[in-house]
């Protein structure tokens, strides 16, 4: 999942000028040590890496003129500070949102994120990854009540040839 998320981030930022995005995970530790750390690995292999700057919390345009408008940020979510997800507007461009281990991300964060996705003529790529660890919440509803709004894939690691079954 982390490798796919990383490649998606690199694809999104490299194929559309002024892409903006937010990546979060179930915990700050997951975000920093797994999701964003995996991005570092793939960024270092990325043929266009000189066009972007990677930091511990951001991936952004190396061109100073675009560093504020062409970027993807790793932002830990907090139920006490949902506003961190409220200002994600990018009229006429692209927005990327990734929720890693999404079943543990508060419904409040999902709602605030949905409210921020109102710009017309904007390409919105919202991907959520996770395991069904809870029997309620917005992630679960991606496969139930809200399944018509999402394209879903369920992958059983027991049937994947390259997974570690130890």
Task: Give the location of each predicted region.
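Phosphate/NTP-binding elements of NTP-utilizing enzymes
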Residues: 1-166
């Amino acid at each position: 999942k982390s490798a796919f998320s990383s490649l998606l981030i690199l694809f999104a930022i490299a194929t559309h000028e002024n892409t903006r995005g937010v990546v979060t995970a179930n915990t700050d530790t997951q975000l920093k040590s797994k999701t964003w750390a995996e991005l570092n690995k793939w960024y270092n292999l990325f043929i266009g890496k000189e066009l972007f700057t990677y930091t511990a919390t951001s991936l952004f345009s190396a061109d100073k003129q675009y560093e504020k408008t062409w970027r993807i940020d790793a932002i830990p979510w907090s139920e006490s500070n949902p506003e961190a997800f409220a200002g994600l507007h990018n009229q006429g461009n692209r927005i990327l949102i990734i929720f890693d281990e999404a079943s543990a991300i508060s419904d409040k964060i999902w709602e605030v994120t949905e409210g921020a996705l109102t710009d017309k003529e904007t390409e919105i790529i919202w991907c959520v990854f996770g395991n069904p660890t809870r029997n309620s919440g917005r992630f679960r509803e991606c496969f139930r009540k809200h399944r018509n709004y999402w394209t879903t894939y369920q992958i059983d690691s027991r049937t994947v040839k390259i997974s570690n079954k130890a």
